[in-house]
Amino acid sequence: MSQGDTVPLHPSSQSDIDEIENLINESVQSGPGTVLAARPPSPTRPSIPVSSSSSSSPFMQSNLPPLHPSSSAQKVTHVPVPPPLPAVSNSSNFQGASAFGSPPNTLTEPVWDTVKRDLSRIVSNLKLVVFPNPYREDPGKALRDWDLWGPFFFIVFLGLTLSWSASVKKSEVFAVAFALLAAGAVILTLNVLLLGGHIIFFQSLSLLGYCLFPLDVGAVICMLKDNVILKMVVVSVTLAWSSWAAYPFMSSAVNPRRKALALYPVFLMYVSVGFLIIAIN
């Protein structure tokens, strides 16, 4: 491109170029020893005051108590120790056997402790059945802890008393008395169950055996006093006593409309035992 083809610059651009050239020429003429003036320092900025005291703090105060790192880091919870259990005696073991729960272990106890426990149970059941008490109308409470040792003892004792009272054939008298009482108790229990009675089989045997206690007392008195009139009076009293002891338990076990069917055989068996006491001489 030739010089004739150049495009002229805008007046403002030409003035800027001229100003730049003038500044360059002035810097060259002034020489290298000239130092330009330094930029003035900027004004200091205001600083935020920081105080260590809590009263001049710009933040809002909290009502929460300060945390202690030592107590929060090592927090120990104290668990209360339960009191020791009281000592259990032998008498409490016997009471626990008749309540709900597992019975106490009696395999390692002395023989004398077992005998004492059985004797105390026999005496307790005898009081509940024969003698007046508030539980006579409730057979479930009266014979809850039933046993067969007491009835077995009263049956054997009555048979021995009758055999001692007999002058001849003592062994036959004992066999007849024992068979009559044992078979009679089983038959009477089956009779109550067939009538729809709500009673346990062995509980009924225990009840009928304990009700023989008055007849045992009457047999001992008749053995000591050989008098027919005295025998009749004693047997009548003891027969009524035994029937009175068995009445509430047997009557409450069956339907009220079948009460006579359950009580009549019981009364008949006790009457048979009474005739044996009077007849044996």
UniProtKB/Swiss-Prot annotation:
Residues passing through the membrane, by range: 148-168, 173-193, 194-214, 229-249, 260-280
Highest rank taxon of the organism: Eukaryota
Disruption phenotype annotation: No visible phenotype. The double mutant yip4a yip4b exhibits disturbed trans-Golgi network (TGN)-Golgi association and cell elongation defects leading to reduced roots and hypocotyls growth associated with an abnormal cell wall composition and a mislocalization of trans-Golgi network (TGN)-localized proteins SYP61 and VHA-a1. The double mutant yip4a yip4b also has a reduced number of root trichoblasts displaying Rho-of-plant (ROPs e.g. ARAC4/ROP2, ARAC5/ROP4 and ARAC3/ROP6) patches and leading to an almost complete absence of root hairs. Strongly reduced ROP2 plasma membrane localization.
Signal peptide: none
Tissues where this protein is expressed: Expressed in developing root hair cells.
A Pfam family it matches: Yip1
Subcellular location: Golgi apparatus, trans-Golgi network membrane
Chain intervals with Low complexity compositional bias: 47-65
Record's bilayer topology term: Multi-pass membrane protein
Cytoplasmic membrane side: 1-147, 250-259
Protein role: Together with YIP4B, involved in the regulation of cell elongation during root and hypocotyl growth. YIP4A and YIP4B are central trafficking components in Rho-of-plant (ROPs, e.g. ARAC4/ROP2, ARAC5/ROP4 and ARAC3/ROP6) small GTPases-dependent root hair formation, thus contributing to activation and plasma membrane accumulation of ROPs during hair initiation. The ECH/YIP4 complex is involved in the modulation of the trans-Golgi network (TGN)-mediated trafficking of some proteins and cell wall components (e.g.
Subunit structure: Homodimer and heterodimer with YIP4B. Component of a trans-Golgi network (TGN)-localized ECH/YIP4 complex made of ECH, YIP4A and YIP4B. Interacts directly with ECH.
Similarity field: Belongs to the YIP1 family.
Name of the protein in question: Protein YIP4a
Provenance organism: Arabidopsis thaliana
Higher taxonomy: Eukaryota, Viridiplantae, Streptophyta, Embryophyta, Tracheophyta
